[in-house]
């Protein structure tokens, strides 16, 4: 039997992690498989021949995309030509939908099987993208169950594979060990997580610090920990903290340790809320956008919730305080009872964790190999 040739394209670090896990699982069933495409250091370490550095696809923000648009379009065109000539057994686009969905469509039209791993947020907004997905994608692999239900309703072949974070984060995190590792004392501890991007931090950090000062008055002895997403964010946060006297420990990265160590979390809506959920830490979710952006999104977004815990629970499991509702007083008062309580939240989190814990990389590999008729049956 000829060796399998699988093409993969990832556009950012999170996709590189998922891609590497998937490649390991594919190699377990087909040790001689060949991998071509675009990926980062983790995928290359698993044997991917990357046609160009993944960083060339890692662009955030409209202005940056426009500045690189000519290069991105040229790279995509060349990639389409190369992969059509190479004729892999299957192509897997990992996240990066603005780049990979068109790639999948062109390759499928050329007779190559296509898989998309990680659903874009079509269930929330720009739902017409599902038409392109249905036309260009033989199989959608979703990390979350409500995404799979959406695609089933839209007639897109789909498999819910679970989330790799749910596989790696323990069902019960050791709070005492995490505090010891961070050198934090006993007593009430709140994690402040105002986001990873400069704009988010600029809009939320000062509000979070004001809320923390109110919490100090409401719960004497409370301390705070804030994991900084990058050196740039740390500088920004230190500037915003000038003149304040909060009992706050800043960390460089280490968000998982901060979550394991804390009793409750004040957090910006985003992927970090899933991490807080998996660590079973009660949370209050807040978000502020530029007023015009909020006005536009309010009219475009189809979902009643914005935070992943509520989307996963399909109910209001965690408080969401958005825009003008995200005042320091409201945040402090909502968070206060969760520091020593929050059992309803944590019970819901445990149920969700068990649902997402499915050995995602092996599930994804099985789905890909079944699609192309190459699944090895267990002996």
From Swiss-Prot:
Q: What are the GO cellular component annotations? A: membrane
InterPro entries registered for this protein in UniProt: Glyco_trans_19
Pfam families found in the cross-reference section: LpxB
Q: Which UniProt keywords apply?
A: Glycosyltransferase, Lipid A biosynthesis, Lipid biosynthesis, Lipid metabolism, Transferase
Q: Signal peptide location in the record?
A: none
Q: Which is an annotated GO molecular function term of this record?
A: lipid-A-disaccharide synthase activity
Please name the SUPFAM superfamilies in this protein's record. UDP-Glycosyltransferase/glycogen phosphorylase
EC number per UniProt? 2.4.1.182
GO BP annotations, alphabetical order: lipid A biosynthetic process
Residues annotated as coiled-coil are none
**Family annotation (Gene3D superfamilies):** Glycogen Phosphorylase B
Reaction(s) catalyzed by this protein?
a lipid X + a UDP-2-N,3-O-bis[(3R)-3-hydroxyacyl]-alpha-D-glucosamine = a lipid A disaccharide + UDP + H(+)
| Pathway field | Bacterial outer membrane biogenesis; LPS lipid A biosynthesis
Function text: Condensation of UDP-2,3-diacylglucosamine and 2,3-diacylglucosamine-1-phosphate to form lipid A disaccharide, a precursor of lipid A, a phosphorylated glycolipid that anchors the lipopolysaccharide to the outer membrane of the cell.
Describe the family membership recorded for this protein in Swiss-Prot or TrEMBL.
Belongs to the LpxB family.
- What this protein is called in its record is Lipid-A-disaccharide synthase
To which species is this protein native? Pseudomonas fluorescens (strain SBW25)
Q: Which lineage?
A: Bacteria, Pseudomonadati, Pseudomonadota, Gammaproteobacteria, Pseudomonadales
């Amino acid at each position: 039997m000829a060796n399998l040739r699988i093409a993969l394209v990832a556009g950012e670090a999170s996709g590189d992690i998922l891609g590497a896990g998937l490649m390991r699982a594919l190699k377990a069933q087909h040790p001689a498989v060949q991998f071509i495409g675009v990926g980062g250091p983790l995928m290359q370490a698993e044997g991917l021949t990357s046609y160009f550095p993944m960083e060339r696809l890692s662009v955030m923000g409209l202005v940056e995309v426009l500045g690189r648009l000519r290069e991105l379009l040229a790279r995509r065109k060349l990639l389409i030509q190369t992969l059509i000539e190479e004729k892999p057994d299957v192509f897997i686009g990992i996240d990066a939908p603005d780049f990979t969905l068109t790639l999948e469509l062109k390759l499928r039209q050329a007779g190559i099987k296509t898989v998309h791993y990680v659903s874009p947020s079509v269930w929330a907004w720009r739902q017409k993208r599902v038409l392109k997905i249905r036309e260009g994608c033989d199989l959608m692999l979703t990390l979350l169950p409500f995404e799979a239900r959406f695609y089933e309703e839209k007639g897109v072949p789909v498999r819910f594979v679970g989330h790799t974070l749910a596989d790696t984060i323990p069902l019960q995190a050791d709070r005492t060990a995490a505090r010891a590792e961070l050198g934090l004392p006993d007593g009430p501890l709140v994690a402040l997580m105002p986001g990873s991007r400069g704009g988010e931090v600029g809009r939320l950090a000062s509000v979070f610090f004001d809320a923390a000062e109110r919490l100090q008055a409401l719960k004497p002895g409370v301390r705070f920990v804030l994991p900084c997403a990058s050196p740039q964010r740390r500088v920004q946060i230190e500037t915003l903290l000038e003149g304040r006297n909060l009992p706050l420990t800043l960390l460089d990265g280490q968000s998982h340790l901060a979550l394991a160590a804390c009793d409750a979390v004040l957090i910006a809506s985003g992927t970090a809320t899933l991490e807080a959920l998996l660590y079973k830490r009660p949370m209050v979710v807040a978000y502020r956008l530029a007023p015009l952006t909020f006005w536009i999104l309010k009219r475009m977004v189809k979902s009643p919730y914005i935070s992943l815990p509520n989307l996963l629970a399909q109910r209001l499991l965690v408080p969401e305080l958005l825009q003008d509702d995200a005042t320091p007083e409201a945040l402090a008062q909502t968070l206060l009872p969760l520091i020593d309580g929050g059992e309803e939240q944590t019970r819901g989190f445990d149920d969700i964790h068990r649902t997402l814990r499915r050995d995602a990389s092996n599930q994804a590999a099985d789905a890909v190999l079944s699609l192309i008729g190459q699944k090895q049956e267990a002996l």
